[in-house]
Design a protein with these regions (language model features):
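Short, surface-exposed recognition loops or helix-turn segments adjacent to catalytic cores
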Residues: 108, 214-215
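Histidine-acidic metal/acid-base catalytic patches
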Residues: 2-4, 9-11, 15-22, 56, ...
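N-terminal basic, low-complexity leaders that serve as flexible interaction/assembly modules and, when applicable
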Residues: 1-45, 52-53
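Generic structural motif recognizing short loop/turn segments at the entrances and edges of beta-strands
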Residues: 1, 127, 140-145, 224, ...
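Structural motif corresponding to the early beta-alpha repeats
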Residues: 29-193, 205, 258
Length: 360
């Protein structure tokens, strides 16, 4: 396993800092990634190659790009003509990535935002983004959820990214559940099947792996505000992978924090999921983060203090032969670290320490 970092709109200064942290593997999380677009709005393989070589100039490899799937899943239910247009652009993006030398693309299955209901004070006064189903309301959803690359609470802490990207391109097609038109379980699975049918054959031919981020968070039975999260359990992840069970192009951005959110026993659940999906060789990258709490009641936290035994997770990745990257994700917010660079530095160091303490 290797230490990785994901960065939105990286600058020369920020990449220099990453190399000083000891990072050798980069994920660019920009969505949409304007630097890669051609005149038609699709990625240009030559621009991807240039970005890859730019990253390599800092001594790092560009392992993964974020594929902006826009609102294709929701559109496949409510606006099929627009879904077809997005699918056409995605096929071009996938081929361009292959042409530019980047062969893993991560993407998110969210149709609505990454639902949160507020903040909980944590260690030393930091604030951790939280989801407590009992406190859910459409108003808290709009105010506290992640929208695309936006981070909740950034307006209070001067974060380096938008506080609320809702309604902007950076929301990458995610909408308020109240304005989604609703998503039943059957519609959710139909949308995912549509996506897989539209893009996996192109990815297979291009030699590109698509790494899906599960639904964050798991919703209660019956969903929230008319929306079901069907990939919110190990069973759901298994069913999703079985939409193309033999395809090496079809795998996971295994968000360990999101998987932990699916259970009242998050540590055991994470280990079980790593064993199953790592054993199937369908984990293509990892969001190595922790939470406090579990199903329907959790808050984000530093990786060393949560409910998941992170050392046990490392041992399990080792056992199943996972040899990809571990990326920190979703650290708390604080006025003392408005860009969260120090907090991500802490998470990187903690991850490096575990990798060294638990060798292959």
């Amino acid at each position: 396993m290797e230490l990785g970092e994901q960065i939105i709109n990286p600058t020369e200064e920020r990449l220099r800092l990453s190399t000083q942290y000891g990072v050798e593997h980069l994920v660019i999380d920009s969505r949409p990634n304007q630097q890669l677009m051609g005149d038609d709005g699709a990625w240009d393989g030559r621009k991807i190659e240039a970005q890859r070589k730019w990253v390599e100039g800092f001594g790092m490899s560009l392992d993964v790009l974020a594929l902006d799937v826009d609102s294709i899943l929701l559109d496949s239910i409510h606006n099929p003509e627009r879904a077809r247009r997005v699918a056409d652009r995605l096929r071009k993006d996938i081929q361009a990535a292959a042409d530019g030398g980047v062969t893993t693309l991560k993407y998110n299955l969210q149709m609505v935002g990454i639902t949160r209901t507020g903040f909980i004070e944590g260690r030393g006064g930091v604030r951790g983004s939280a989801f407590q189903a009992r406190n859910y309301s459409p108003n808290s959803d709009e105010k506290f959820s992640y929208w695309g690359v936006g981070h909740p609470g950034a307006d209070q802490h001067g974060s380096d990214i938008a506080a609320n990207a809702l309604g902007t391109k950076e929301a990458v097609g995610q909408v308020l559940s109240a304005k989604s038109g609703g998503v039943t379980q059957q519609q959710g699975w139909d949308a995912l099947a549509y996506f897989v049918e539209q893009v996996i054959p192109t990815a297979e031919k291009a030699g590109v792996r698509l790494a899906a981020h599960p639904h964050d968070p798991a919703y209660p039975p019956g969903g929230l505000n008319g929306v079901e999260h069907v990939v919110g359990s190990i069973d759901g992840i298994r069913k999703f992978l079985d939409l193309a069970p033999e395809s090496v192009a079809h795998g996971l951005n295994f968000c360990q924090g999101t998987v932990a959110e699916m259970s009242e026993d998050p540590s055991a659940y994470v280990v079980e999921a790593i064993r199953e999906f790592g054993g199937r060789k369908r984990i293509y990258m990892v969001h190595f983060r922790n939470i406090k709490g579990g199903y329907l009641d959790f808050s984000e936290c530093f990786p060393d203090e949560g409910s998941v035994d992170m050392a046990a997770a490392i041992r399990t990745y080792r056992e199943v032969g996972y040899d990809g990257i571990l990326c920190p994700d979703h650290v708390p917010v604080s006025d003392l670290d408005p860009a969260r660079e120090r907090f991500f530095g802490f998470a990187l160091g903690y991850t490096r320490g575990l990798l060294q303490a638990i060798p292959a």
